[in-house]
Amino acid sequence: MQGEAKRDYPASIHGQSAWYRQYRYVEDYYARIHLLMEQGQPLCDVLVINPVESLWAGIYPGWADGLTAADPAVGAVEEGYRTVFGSLCAAKADFDFGDEDMLARLGAVESGPDGVRLRIGKMTYRTVVVPKMLTMRASTLEWLKAFGEQGGEVWFTAGRPEYVDAQRSAQANTIPGLDRELADVETALI
C-alpha cells in the first residue's frame, strides 16, 4: 500500500468511540427510512442503456493514457455517456441505467392499459435512451426493435451504433426510434 491508504484510521463503532452511546439515534433514523423506502415500489419511466460493452470493444494496447482515453472513438463514447448523464440530471429526470446483459436475461416487452413498457426484472420503462455506442448486442437490438414496433419510445442521442455484436452492421437502423438531440430529450422529459 502507498500514500494515504496506509494511514487511514476510520472511526470504529465500539465502546471506545466518544459518540458510541448516541450512535443508536443515527442508526434508528436510518432504519426508519429503510422501512419506509422498503414499503414502496420505485417508479422510473426512463432507461439509459449503459455503453460499457462499447468501451470494452474499444480496448487495445495503448487505448488509454492513464485514466484518459487516447482513442478518439472511446473518448466520444465516454463523452456521450457523460453528457447524457449530466443532461438528464440537469433536467431532474428520474432514470435508471440498463446493462445489455441484464436486458438479454431479464428483458420483456409488455402492453398494458398505460401503454407499452420495456420490463427488466421488476422495473418497467416507457422510454429508452441510447447514448453514443460503438457496438450493441444483437439481443439488445431485438428488444429495442420489438419495443419500438409496439409503440415504445427509443431515443438515440448520438446516432445509431455502426456495429452489432462487434461486427459492422446497419441493423441498428432498423430499430424504430427517434434520433434526438439532448436538448430535445431534456424538454420531452420535463
Model-assigned labels for residue ranges:
Residues 1-190:
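Carbohydrate-binding surfaces of carbohydrate-active enzymes
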